[in-house]
Amino acid sequence: MGDAILAGFSMGTGEVTRYLGRYGSSRVRKVVLLGAIPPFLLKRDDNPEGVDGKVFEDMKAAVVKDRYAYFKDFLDNFYNVDVLAPDRVSEQAWQASFAVAAASSPHASHACIDSWLADFRADLPRIDVPTLVVHGTEDRILPIAATADRLPGLIADLRLVRIEGGPHNIGWTHSEQVNRALLEFLA
């Protein structure tokens, strides 16, 4: 396989980034990152723009205490339902997402939070193909200031599309804008 377009959403953007960091882009033509997790989410001395580690510890504690309540809070912020429901996300769409989350492994629900803290900074310079990043300006899961807004300059050929008012799941709530950006980039 060659001439591939790699695309990822949320945690999947980390998978795409790590793949290119490890294996290079010889078989890849373009990259799409929707709701990007890179460069590095965790706040540290060498990453002051990151998110405080207590946020993630509190999330893991919430999963242990009552993962269904955690899923409700997470999905409310995934879609920004307080602002966008019912016009951009229906109760049925939210319930479908909840059903998927509830069917997940309890262990995976907890363990995946640590995977969000992977450091992709060394992988980013290896991305040497045209890259589209599409991110919601009101993303409460992966705040744009800690993620996508930091990518220009870290990836050589990057186009950043900021979806005004967009939550984390912009593919659902702002599909027209996301699809337009994708079609323009892939043309």
Task: Give each language-model segment a name.
Residues 137-140, 165-167:
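Acidic beta-to-alpha connecting loop that harbors the catalytic carboxylate
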Residues 17-65:
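Flexible "cap/lid" loop of the alpha/beta hydrolase fold
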Residues 140-146:
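Conserved alpha/beta-hydrolase "acid-adjacent" motif
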Residues 156-187:
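Catalytic active-site module of serine/aspartate enzymes centered on a nucleophile-bearing elbow/loop
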